[in-house]
Amino acid sequence: MKMPKNAPPRTKKHSNGTQNGPLNQNLPSLLIGTGEHKELVMQMPLSTRDGNGRHGLKLAEPVQRGLSPWLNPTQLNRPTFLMNFPFSYATGSPNNPWMKDLPDQKRAPDFKRAAVQFLQVYQNISAEGLVYLLPTPRDGDLQDLLYTANLGIVLEHLPDKNTVVISNFKSPPRRGETPLGVKFFQDMGYNVHVAPAKFEGEAELKHLYDNIYVGGYGIRSEIETYEWMEQTFDMRIIKVQEVEKYLYHLDCSIFPITKENTLVGTELFTKKEVRELAKFTNIIPVSVDECFSGICNSVRLPNQVLNSSHIHDLKAGTQDYQYEITKNRKLEDICSNLAMEVAYFNLSEFHKSGALLSCMVMHLNRHCYKIALTA
């Protein structure tokens, strides 16, 4: 296009209309946030023809922030979860007995297969609610970041639905996840706390109902964490000691399937601990073998329980096949009695790091448990 003879020379301007200089203080702007996290948002000039006047571009009117009834995902009236795509997944630092039992060549993951297996779980959960994906930093050595159940716990019983406790990892390869989790939830506007003693997330602390939780300690988490939580957040935590080194997180041996019923590997705890837990929930006993096969490593959706099963990779008639089919039938019977179905996912690539399905999912709320089903 030919420039008019009397037109002024073109100069490069910032989006706020200033020419290579500081922000124009006369332009409308918004301040978002509080304290040191305030963010300045400038209004952009209109670029449409109708916005051009004889004195130059007309500025857009200041716009108020949307008055959403929700401040964060936890407050949504639908199931909400946090997952992480396995961009940084690796098995180079064996940090649990399952990994140490595997030779290096059998522990190496098939990344394409891992991606397919992850997406099958993700697609199923996202069909029932909102799934946030935790970003993976490019320069981080975070082999277990995809196991978001260990990142922390959102405290369901607090009325503001805005408080999260981030993990203080015992496992050295996972300690870099703590600052990442703090930043993620701070950016989302949560009140963020870091556990003062060792603690590895909701995989170790299961919500039952109201302010009642059950917490596991002794291998990856410390009892001092739960004492601090009780004093700080008005919680009642039934504390149970974990002693089986292969079942090193509580989600391996306890699974609240409804607000009233909880699967418990009763042989893994003392009689006193089981009696105390029975005061608060109806215990559905499961065997040690069923725990080893992952019956408690499940995730509850509104009318469905998700569980990992690689039974089609196993040879019929073998001991491993028998363990797996026994676990599956037990879970199906339990779910049938509670008017729920079971959905199975082959997560064999994640077995290489000692993980099952519940490890991959962090609850941002417990809306699924508000739905009562009747058989």
Question: How would you label these PLM feature ranges?
Answer:
Residues 2-4, 10, 17, 21-375:
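The feature marks the mature, well-folded catalytic cores of soluble enzymes
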